[in-house]
From Swiss-Prot:
Heterohexadecamer of 8 large chains and 8 small chains. GO terms for molecular function: magnesium ion binding; monooxygenase activity; ribulose-bisphosphate carboxylase activity. Belongs to the RuBisCO large chain family. Type I subfamily. GO terms for cellular component: chloroplast. The keyword Chloroplast applies. The modification N6-carboxylysine is found at residue 194. One of its GO terms (biological process) is reductive pentose-phosphate cycle. The active site is at residues 168, 287. It comes from Couroupita guianensis. This is Ribulose bisphosphate carboxylase large chain. The record marks 327 as: Transition state stabilizer.
Length: 468
């Protein structure tokens, strides 16, 4: 009979899924969840429930459990600790056997780990703070199409951060005028210009027209400056097929870089595009539109460091990473923590920076973090110091808002950057002497002097939301 040895009924998750004696394996995917149980639910039961519902468990005992070796496939909550300074919040550590996940699929990884469990009634709130991805799993992903070193070699740009600018107004320009703005910024000294993430293919500017005029602008600026230039042509569309069509056209135009919104576009589409980009020599710029829907709340959702790790696996050469200064938030230590996760090959566990696990990226190419959002020339010393050479500093309004126009705005940013890099290389302290360095440079650059005057009082200061 089917019922032999099968005891129906509901039993506590913690009897099966809370295993404090478990020794984690090198091949396990490890997760750190911030758990807020409902009143009356013990933390062990809450942690075990998370492990169960994100792996093999369901709410009742089922007889088909007997047809598999549950011990081999179940997630295990192996450690729980209270969050200091928070009432009724715990960090629950969960280990998942590698066999639960399809190779090379961020989509499947997230569907398993965060797909179902966040609506669970026994929890008041749940946040995924960090993941440890084992080398065995990382090796099943291509990762970024090119990575930091290959990008520098392609662009022939070394020893400094790269400069970008988002073309504004983001919506409403015709393709010809849009291309004109691109040309002016690149001609003035920027390395890149960028489609705003909202720009896809709207009635006032269809994608193909924009691609053609931007390519023309780029080649003209290259011919005049002798530098390699790029414009992030935004490829997302209503279907993946249409997105690939746009990427293919970008390659036919011979431009160096395309762009994707990886969260709104989805990980499956993003990984397909990343594979195409590596096969065809295109760089891939990633925007994180929609991230704050997922990562803004301190006690529920998913921290951006997890989304950043996932992007490195799925594939992208640049990703927006907040600014530390400017209008979009990012606490300094926490931001630098996930910036290292994007760029470095080996990152040590460091709870003071929000890094819960040591992560070995086994030589997967790195991703350039992009600092953008409400930044201008006065921020240049801080940005150069905080983000270092391997970054893209992106000034939208901070270029196009220059009183003399786009090209002088670009000149001001380039002069400010070169001055900061030179000062740093001479051993000066950018944090302390930053304003002085910018002032000195503005004496021989009227464009920079005008920019300094316009933005001398602008600040976006609010208390940070993201604390440890």
């Amino acid at each position: 009979k089917a019922s032999v040895g099968f005891k129906a009924g509901v039993k506590d998750y913690k009897l099966t899924y809370y295993t404090p004696e478990y020794k984690t394996l090198d091949t396990d995917i490890l997760a750190a969840f911030r758990v807020t149980p409902q009143p009356g639910v013990p933390p062990e039961e809450a942690g075990a429930a998370v492990a169960a519902e994100s792996s093999t468990g369901t709410w009742t005992t089922v007889w088909t459990d007997g047809l598999t070796t549950l011990d081999r496939y179940k997630g295990r909550c192996y450690h729980i600790e209270p969050v200091p300074g928070e009432d009724n919040q715990y960090i629950a550590y969960v280990a998942y056997p590698l066999d639960l996940f399809e190779e090379g699929s961020v989509t499947n990884m997230f569907t398993s780990i965060v797909g179902n469990v966040f609506g669970f009634k026994a929890l008041r709130a749940l946040r995924l703070e960090d993941l440890r991805i084992p080398p065995a799993y990382i090796k099943t992903f291509q990762g970024p199409p090119h990575g930091i070193q290959v990008e520098r070699d392609k662009l022939n740009k070394y020893g400094r951060p790269l400069l970008g600018c988002t073309i504004k107004p983001k919506l409403g320009l015709s393709a010809k005028n849009y291309g004109r703005a691109v040309y002016e910024c690149l001609r003035g000294g920027l390395d890149f210009t960028k489609d705003d993430e909202n720009v896809n293919s709207q009635p006032f500017m269809r994608w193909r027209d924009r691609f053609v005029f931007c390519a023309e602008a780029l080649y003209k600026a290259q011919a005049e400056t002798g530098e390699i230039k790029g414009h992030y042509l935004n490829a997302p569309a209503g279907t993946s097929e249409e997105m690939m069509k746009r990427a293919i056209f970008a390659r036919e135009l011979g431009v160096p870089i395309v762009m994707h919104d990886y969260l709104t576009g989805g990980f499956t589409a993003n990984t397909s595009l990343a594979h195409y980009c590596r096969d065809n020599g295109l760089l891939l710029h990633i925007h994180r539109a929609m991230h704050a829907v997922i990562d803004r709340q301190k006690n529920h959702g998913m921290h951006f460091r997890v989304l950043a790790k996932a992007l490195r696996m799925s594939g992208g050469d640049h990703i927006h990473a907040g600014x530390v200064v400017g209008k979009l938030e990012g606490e300094r230590e926490i931001t630098l923590g996930f910036v290292d996760l994007l760029r470095d090959d080996y990152i040590e566990k460091d709870r003071s920076r929000g890094i819960y696990f040591t992560q070995d990226x086994v030589s997967m190419p790195g991703v350039l973090p992009v600092a953008s959002g409400g930044i201008h020339v006065w921020h240049m010393p801080a940005l150069t110091e905080i983000f270092g050479d391997d970054s893209v500093l992106q000034f939208g309004g901070g270029t196009l808002g220059h009183p003399w126009g786009n090209a002088p705005g670009a000149v001001a940013n380039r002069v400010a950057l070169e001055a900061c890099v030179q000062a740093r290389n001479e051993g000066r302290d950018l944090a302390r002497e930053g304003n002085e360095i910018i002032r000195a440079a503005s004496k021989w650059s009227p464009e920079l002097a005008a920019a300094c005057e316009v933005w001398k009082e602008i600040k976006f200061e609010f208390p940070a939301m993201d604390t440890l």
